[in-house]
Amino acid sequence: MNNIPQVKVGIVAVSRDCFPESLSVNRRKALIDAYTKKFGATEIYECPVCIVESEIHMVQALEDVKNAGCNALVVYLGNFGPEISETLLAKHFDGPVMFCAAAEESAEDLMDGRGDAYCGMLNASYNLKLRNVKVYIPEYPVGTADECADMIHEFMPIARTIIGLKSLKIISFGPRPLNFLACNAPIKPLYDLGVEIEENSELDLFEAFNKHEGDPRIPKVVEDMEKELGKGNMKPEILPKLAQYEITLLDWVEDHRGYREYV
């Protein structure tokens, strides 16, 4: 049972039109190279579209990362960046989003090599707040290619958690039957997180358990339990019942998964 989300992060560079687009593109390539050398390339995707103060570019980048199967996004300011289109990208992307920006490489080239991405991050964060768009911004979001690669790697478990919660169903058993949520305010915080919860009666679980008596899968599960317990197997006589219970729960998960990916 696959119950852990696989994250694929699309990395989109953005550029303001009063700065060279090549500055953002080259810095994006350096970032991709740095991440690949440190962590491999399986979890990232380099979007070829550089957004240059254009809502059309934003739509093109959005479609590109969607078609590439990305479920998380990094908006990378290679220079000051276009506040409108970069924040629109974050608004319309259906998944966790991170913002980071490129530090200046050198003080020797302040004509074509200066990006002012630090200032761009300040403006981007303000515009995101104006739009009520929530994204992840590292504590120090401006850095070299290596430093931004580390930031993206730190974003991975955050993205995985958000993706998982949005597609998670919690199944529980208690005194209430299914579809009887009256007087159950404690589940509201789960709804606020985007988590679905299905409460079932313990009597339903007991009935399902009894229906699994003599299930042909029980001996194999018992054998696996014996291997796991080793010398700690002090009560082997209860293992068949535990195996029956495990199979009951696994079948329940598959039968009650509904439209959720993770249970």
Language-model segments: which ranges?
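Metallocofactor- and cofactor-centric catalytic cores in central/energy metabolism, strongly enriched
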Residues: M1-I163, S167-I171, R176-R260
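Conserved metal-phosphate-binding beta-hairpin within the catalytic cores
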Residues: V263
